[in-house]
Amino acid sequence: MFTERAGEGQNMEKAIRVLHVLGGVSLGGAESRIMDLYRQMNREEIQFDFLVHASAVKRGFQEMRRIADGSEKQNEKGDGCVRKPEFYDEEIQAMGGHIYVLPKFKVYNYFSYRKAVKKFFAAHREFQVVQGHMTSTAGIYLPIARRAGVPVVVAHARNAGVVKGLKGLATRFFRRGLAKKADYCFACSVLAGQDVFGEAAMKSGQVKVIYNAIDVGRFTYDEKVRQEARARLGIAGALVLGHVGRFEYQKNHPYLLEVFAAVCEKRKDAVLLLLGDGEDRTAMEEKCRQLGIAERVYFLGNQKDAWRYYQAMDIFLLPSFFEGLPGVLVEAQAAGLRCMVSDTVTREAKATDLVTYLSIEETPRRWAEEILRQADYARRDTSKELQEAGFDVRTQAQGYRRFYLTGDSSQI
């Protein structure tokens, strides 16, 4: 499989190219973990490219006008798709990576989607590895990539659950037999591996669990940064709760806001920092008004320096319906934060004693009681604990380098 490229330690005329397949390159969990890894790569040896998904449109006057004025951007590497610039676009391009575009998969466009994938891989023969993080359609694009001559195809499970309804059912359907369609199967946790690849694949040892590693040093607790961040937000003396995540069903924001409202009944100095963006943001802003907490909730959007906001927080909240292995929970622990987390989240994410698991079947008041009980504590440097638990991206990057160059995944 790896015979077409130079082995580790050999001279290479140019970098091998690894294609990561994702929904997009916004500030999401999988995207952020891949970017953490990308920054650690020697790009003279290994270069990352990205294949993302966007809505296919007819190029009428209005569409071309939006492209011309920069409010929407047609990627010249796309196929009839128009996409808005996303969070990581500039950094990827600055590091020498390319962003390619496929039409979003909608089930009804199954045949046109397959056609677009075939056309893409027929035109691009430069990839030595295709790593599919978008497992909902990996059963389609990985076999096509393999038949097109890509030496190695990888399916990487990044989540442990699907949304409700027909969309979730479709995801389950198209994931069937995925373990047999990839040369390597990776999962961010046992839970994610079981959900995506199935119990049999996990028990057979076919799936390798690779934790979502972070740049631990960037998040290490710093009292000076904490004071500066709180002063800038005007919350110097407040009890600061926080959450980082997309505004979407999975993250369970309605419940989170109800928990915060219950905290506010007991602590008049409490505030909530919400980092992230998404389609449900407007609805959550309205819910804040309904709960009477709008003036105490800070909708901060996507932030390049999210690590500063972790320093400002006192308690981190993650009441998700499901997760793979949430990188934000690892980041929060790296910042020395106490974390209140849904018991649906894998225990593999607990790298320190700072994590408390609670059921989202409990009343919001029960969560509020636990938050207030644990609110007074001394922050500490947890970097060594995170490193020893396998969450340091610098160490993980060495294993990935070996894998990309030789096919040996044992060191990841």
Where are the predicted features?
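A conserved mid-protein helix/loop that constitutes part of the nucleotide-sugar donor-binding site
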Residues: 31-36, 239, 243-262, 279-286
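A short helix/loop element that forms part of the nucleotide-sugar donor recognition site in Leloir-type
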Residues: 117, 220-235
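Nucleotide-activated donor-binding/catalytic signature segment of Leloir-type glycosyltransferases, i.e.
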Residues: 285-301
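A short, active-site helix/loop in glycosyltransferases that binds the activated sugar's phosphate group
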Residues: 182-220
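N-terminal strand-loop element at the rim of the active site
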Residues: 14-112, 206, 279, 403
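Short His-centered aromatic/hydrophobic patch
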Residues: 132-138, 157
